[in-house]
C-alpha cells in the first residue's frame, strides 16, 4: 500500500490521478490533497478518499473548507506555505506534483528533501530550476518518475537501456488546434479557439501552452534535465494523432517508441505503480482507428514560442526561469482576451532580453528571477497595450 499526496488534486491531472487510485484501492491510500481555489471539489474529494490532511492554497477559502469538512476527521490547512510543508509528512510515500506553473517549485524541493518519491506532472519545476532539482535528487537519493505522457514514454523506452548511449530523443507534439495555420491567422485567434485541443483533455493554462507550442518547449527543457541529454539531442516532431507519445534513438540507429491511446491515466498509473505494470480498464489502442500515423517538422517561424524555449534551454542559467515567468503572465492575459495570441511571444522575447542573466543561479536567484521576469513582462505588456 502506497500513501499518496496529490498537490493540485482538483485540476486535470489531479482528478485523473484520483480516478487511478479509485480503480486500485488495494494499492493506494490518499494521505494529502491540496488545491488552490476549488474548495467544493476539494471537500468532495476529501469526503470520498478520507485523507489525513487537506490544504487550500487560497487562504480566504479556509473557513469555507473547514465548514464543509466539519463532520470529517481531516486536518484542514490553508496557504502556499502549508502546501510546501505538508509534503514532508512522514507517512507519505509518493508526492504527485500536479500543481500548474511556478507554484510547484518549493513544494517539490521540500518533498525531495524529505526523501519522497516524486511523480512529476509539474514540468515548470524542471523548466525553472532543473539544475538545482537534479542536484537535490542526487543528494537526497530520491526517484523522479515522469507523469507527462511524452516523458513517461521516453522513460519507458529507456528501461533496460542503462548502459546504451542515447543518440536522440524524438519528442512528439500534437501540433495543437492551430497546426498548419499561418502567422496572419494566429493574430486573430481567441482564447475560446485555443482551448479546443484536438486530442487531450487538459487544464486551461496547459491547453493554451499547447496551442502556442510553449508546452512542447517546456517539455524539451524537462527532457534535458530528466534524461541528461543536450538540447541538440532533442528533436520535436509534430504527430497529429497523439498515439506515439515519444521515441528514443540509440547510437546503433535503432529507435524505440511508446504507443497508446491519448489518455493521461496511462502515464499516471505507470508512475504510481512503477516498476510494476498493473491491469487497467483503460481503452486499448485499436490500430484500425488509426490507419495512418504521420509526422512532420514543427513550424518554428509561425509558432515562435518553441524557438524561444530552445533559445532559453541553450542559454541555460536563469533564462528558462524568466521564460516561464513571462509566459505565465502572458497566458493569464490571453485567457482574459487582453492580448493577442501572437503578441504573447513578443512580450516573452523582450522580457528574456531585459532580465539580468545569471549563469549558475541559487534558489534565491531563481525566486528573484521569477519575480523580475513577471514584473518586466507586465511592464512590456502595458507598453504594448498603450501602443494599440
Whereabouts are the PLM-identified features?
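Catalytic, metal-anchored helix/loop core of enzyme active sites in primary metabolism
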Residues: 1-388
Amino acid at each position: 500500500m502506497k500513501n499518496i499526496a496529490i498537490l493540485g488534486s482538483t485540476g486535470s491531472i489531479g482528478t485523473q490521478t484520483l480516478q487511478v487510485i479509485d480503480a486500485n484501492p488495494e494499492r493506494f491510500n490518499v494521505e494529502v490533497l491540496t488545491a488552490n481555489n476549488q474548495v467544493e471539489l476539494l471537500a468532495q474529494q476529501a469526503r470520498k478518499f478520507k485523507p489525513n490532511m487537506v490544504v487550500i492554497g487560497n487562504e480566504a477559502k479556509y473557513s469555507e473548507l473547514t465548514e464543509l469538512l466539519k463532520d470529517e476527521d481531516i486536518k484542514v490547512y490553508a496557504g502556499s506555505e502549508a502546501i510546501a510543508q505538508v509534503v514532508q509528512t512522514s507517512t507519505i510515500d509518493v508526492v504527485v506534483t500536479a500543481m500548474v506553473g511556478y507554484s510547484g517549485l518549493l513544494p517539490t524541493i521540500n518533498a525531495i528533501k524529505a526523501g519522497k518519491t516524486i511523480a512529476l506532472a509539474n514540468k515548470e519545476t524542471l523548466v525553472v530550476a532543473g539544475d538545482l532539482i537534479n542536484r537535490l535528487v542526487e543528494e537526497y537519493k530520491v526517484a523522479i518518475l515522469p507523469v507527462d505522457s511524452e516523458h513517461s514514454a521516453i522513460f519507458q523506452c529507456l528501461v533496460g537501456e542503462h548502459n546504451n548511449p542515447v543518440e536522440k530523443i524524438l519528442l512528439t507534439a500534437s501540433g495543437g488546434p492551430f497546426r498548419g495555420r499561418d502567422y496572419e491567422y494566429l493574430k486573430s485567434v481567441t482564447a475560446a479557439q485555443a482551448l479546443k485541443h484536438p486530442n487531450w483533455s487538459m487544464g486551461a493554462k496547459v491547453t493554451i501552452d499547447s496551442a502556442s507550442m510553449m508546452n512542447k518547449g517546456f517539455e524539451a527543457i524537462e527532457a534535458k534535465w530528466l534524461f541528461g541529454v543536450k538540447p541538440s539531442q532533442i528533436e520535436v516532431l509534430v504527430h497529429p494523432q497523439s498515439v506515439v507519445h515519444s521515441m528514443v534513438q540509440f547510437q546503433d540507429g535503432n529507435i524505440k517508441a511508446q504507443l497508446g491511446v491519448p489518455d493521461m491515466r496511462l502515464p499516471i498509473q505507470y508512475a504510481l505503480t512503477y516498476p510494476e505494470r498493473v491491469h487497467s480498464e483503460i481503452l486499448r489502442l485499436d490500430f484500425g482507428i488509426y490507419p495512418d500515423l504521420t509526422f512532420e517538422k514543427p513550424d518554428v517561424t509561425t509558432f515562435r514560442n518553441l524557438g524561444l524555449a530552445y533559445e532559453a534551454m541553450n542559454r541555460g542559467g536563469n533564462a528558462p526561469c524568466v521564460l516561464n515567468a513571462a509566459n505565465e503572465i502572458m497566458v493569464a492575459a490571453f485567457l482574459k482576451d487582453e492580448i493577442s495570441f501572437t503578441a504573447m511571444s513578443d512580450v516573452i522575447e523582450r522580457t528574456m532580453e531585459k532580465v539580468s542573466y545569471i549563469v549558475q543561479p541559487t534558489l534565491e536567484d531563481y525566486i528573484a528571477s521569477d519575480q523580475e521576469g513577471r514584473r518586466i513582462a507586465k511592464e512590456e505588456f502595458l507598453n504594448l497595450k498603450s501602443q494599440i
